[in-house]
Amino acid sequence: MPAHRHLVPQRASKGHLRLTEGELRHWGEDLGRAATPPLLITLTGELGVGKTTLAQSICFGYGVKEEITSPTYALVHEYVAAKSPVFHIDLYRLESPEQLTNLGWDEIVSSRALVLVEWPERAESRLPDDHLPIDLDYTADDPTRRILLAG
């Protein structure tokens, strides 16, 4: 059983949750409070689905005091928390997996930190096997987000 299995809520039916935006924020905070480093969480989903909102909530629950902003242009933001550093990485603008080396990818993912990665599919095979994947989805006529957890 993966070390992060305790982070998947019992109410998840077959690994799925349906949450409003407010519930997503609360769940993210709970996830952050329960997270134990080292932990890499990947956040996938279309633009505007709530990946950064969830990352902000996880960071808040984890104890980050700073304002959490999207790292779309900087690619990586590092934050301080009592448990460990937090790296929030957005790979949307990454043009090739080779650029990960310039970001310090290997050092970050092997560190004793909480690592949140948006657009992880751009990292291809360089993701560690023991990460927690979270996939977010929504439809325009439904105010909830569908969360798929693989744990």
Spans of model-derived segments:
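Conserved lysine of the Walker
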Residues: 51
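Short hydrophobic/aromatic beta-strand immediately N-terminal to the Walker A/P-loop
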Residues: 40-42
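Short beta-strand-centered segment that lines the nucleotide-binding/catalytic pocket of NTP-utilizing
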Residues: 64-79
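Switch II (G3) loop of P-loop NTPases
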Residues: 86-96
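P-loop (Walker A) phosphate-binding loop of NTP-binding proteins
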Residues: 44-46
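Short phosphate-coordinating micro-motif centered on Lys-Gly-acidic
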Residues: 2-19, 60, 95-101, 106-151
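Pre-Walker A adenine-sensing motif
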Residues: 25-34
